[in-house]
A protein has these predicted regions:
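Residue(s) in the substrate-gating loop at a strand-loop-helix junction
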Residues: 148
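Substrate-binding pocket helix/loop in short-chain dehydrogenase/reductase
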Residues: 103-105, 112-114
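Conserved glycine-rich cofactor-binding loop
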Residues: 13, 20-21
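Active-site helix of classical SDR
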Residues: 128, 164
Length: 243
């Protein structure tokens, strides 16, 4: 199935966490090109603001906001800004995440374990908690969680990361059932290794064969352009050739 970029998202408001680089930037850029108003968030406020300015320079509507998804007060402030400034959120892409160190589980320090779960799981909960009331009020919305194939298959020396993504998948399926009656769709994308600085298993792989950020952005476009009577709950995204 090919992404249908001929569909206009004019009037739609999209929020992309971790939107300052890599996968998040690719997703934000693609949604803006489809005429959505895009709010990019990230801990590096200067970076997301610069990316937003670059998008505005190309004639798109964008705003960059500093937000740490692991900080409840920061996320609640973002939610209040969205409510006052835009009055709605049609698309939420929970992309912010961390990989953590490559380590056997019994060697992983508790602080690293906590950091992985704060970002990859609790941060998604905070964002959903903040944005869903706006979607319910509007009677529509689409939440897209960026997970990983590591949430389907064990990742040696990355058990904590795998566990966080298994948790994110479970959260996605559960919230999808909770919100179906509210006309809110919830999808999860599980990509394999993507050629970004983030990739926890990038070293030693043939990056030419890895997925690119635009591949994940294509999957997001495919999801948000589905006809309203259906939705795709899960996308498993693999490279054609094994890196």
């Amino acid at each position: 199935m090919q992404p249908n970029e001929s569909v206009s998202l004019s009037g739609a408001v999209a929020v992309v966490t971790g939107g300052g680089r890599g996968i998040g930037q690719a997703i934000a850029t693609r949604l803006a090109a489809m005429d959505a108003t895009v709010i990019l968030t990230g801990r590096d406020e200067a970076r997301v603001q610069q990316v937003a300015r670059d998008m505005e320079g190309r004639g798109h509507r964008a705003e960059g906001i500093g937000c740490d998804v692991t900080d409840l007060a920061s996320v609640e402030a973002l939610g209040e800004h969205l409510r006052k400034t835009y009055g709605r959120v049609d698309i939420l892409v929970n992309n912010a995440g961390i990989g953590g160190p490559s380590a056997l589980l019994h060697e992983l320090v508790p602080d690293d374990w906590d950091a992985i779960f704060r970002t990859n799981l609790r941060g998604v909960y905070y964002m959903i908690r903040s944005v869903v009331p706006l979607m319910i009020a509007a009677g529509t919305g689409h939440i897209i969680n960026i997970s990983s194939l590591a949430g389907k298959n064990p990742l040696p020396r990355g058990a904590a990361y795998s566990a966080s993504k298994w948790g994110l998948n479970g959260l996605s399926y559960g919230v999808a059932e909770e919100l179906r009656g509210q006309n809110i769709r919830v999808s999860v994308i599980c990509p394999g290794s993507v050629d970004t600085d983030f990739s926890p298993r990038r070293g030693g792989k043939d990056t030419r064969k890895m997925l690119k950020p635009d591949d994940v952005a294509n999957a997001v476009v495919m999801l948000v352009t589905q006809e309203p009577q259906s939705f795709i709950s899960e996308v498993l995204l693999r490279p054609t050739q094994k890196p």
